[in-house]
């Protein structure tokens, strides 16, 4: 019985800190993931725009010659 009471006491002291850390880390990690995804999408859209511009230039060059 002595072990059980020590375990319950430990978990009851530990649980609020665990919850607090979890509540702090969850939004931070979500923000990090979202910003990384936004950065990747911006890079992809810039690359796509660059490819479209070079393709249009190539087509214009073929038409002009």
Curated annotation (Swiss-Prot):
The record marks 22 as: Involved in opening and closing mechanism of the pentameric structure. Four species of SH have been detected in infected cell cytoplasm: a 7.5 kDa non-glycosylated form (SH0), a 13-15 kDa form that contains one or two N-linked carbohydrate side chains of the high-mannose type (SHg), a 21-30 kDa polylactosaminoglycan-modified form of the protein (SHp), and the isoform generated by alternative translational initiation. Of these different forms, SH0 is by far the most abundant protein detected during virus infection. Tyrosine phosphorylated. Pfam families: SHP. GO terms for molecular function: channel activity. Residues 38-43 are annotated as: Interaction with small-molecule inhibitor. The chain crosses the membrane at residues 21-44. Residues 1-20 are intravirion. Channel activity is inhibited by copper. Also inhibited by small-molecule pyronin B. It is a single-pass type II membrane protein. Disulfide bonds: none annotated. GO terms for cellular component: host cell endoplasmic reticulum membrane; host cell Golgi membrane; host cell plasma membrane; membrane; virion membrane. One of its GO terms (biological process) is monoatomic ion transmembrane transport. Residues 45-65 are virion surface. Keywords: Activation of host caspases by virus, Glycoprotein, Host cell membrane, Host endoplasmic reticulum, Host Golgi apparatus, Host membrane, Host-virus interaction, Ion channel, Ion transport, Membrane, Modulation of host cell apoptosis by virus, Phosphoprotein, Signal-anchor, Transmembrane, Transmembrane helix, Transport, Viral ion channel, Virion. Residues 6-15 are annotated as: Interaction with host BCAP31. Glycans are attached at residue 52. It is found in: Virion membrane; Host cell membrane; Host Golgi apparatus membrane; Host endoplasmic reticulum membrane. Its main location: virion. Belongs to the orthopneumovirus small hydrophobic protein family. Homopentamer forming a funnel-like pore. Interacts with glycoprotein G; this interaction occurs on the surface of virion particles and infected cells. Interacts with host BCAP31 (via C-terminus); this interaction is direct. Viroporin that forms a homopentameric ion channel displaying low ion selectivity. May play a role in virus morphogenesis and pathogenicity at various stages of the viral life cycle. Accumulates at the membrane of the Golgi apparatus in infected cells and may facilitate virus release by modifying the secretory pathway. May enhance host membrane permeability and disrupt cellular ion homeostasis, which can be sensed as damage-associated molecular patterns/danger signals, triggering NLRP3 inflammasome activation and inflammatory immune response. This is Small hydrophobic protein. It comes from Human respiratory syncytial virus B (strain 18537). The gene is SH.
């Amino acid at each position: 019985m002595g072990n059980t009471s020590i375990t319950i006491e430990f978990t009851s002291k530990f649980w609020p800190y665990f919850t607090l850390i979890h509540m702090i880390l969850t939004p931070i990690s979500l923000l990090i993931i979202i910003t990384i995804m936004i950065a990747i999408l911006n890079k992809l859209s810039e690359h796509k725009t660059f490819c479209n511009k070079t393709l249009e230039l190539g087509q214009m060059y073929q038409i002009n010659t």
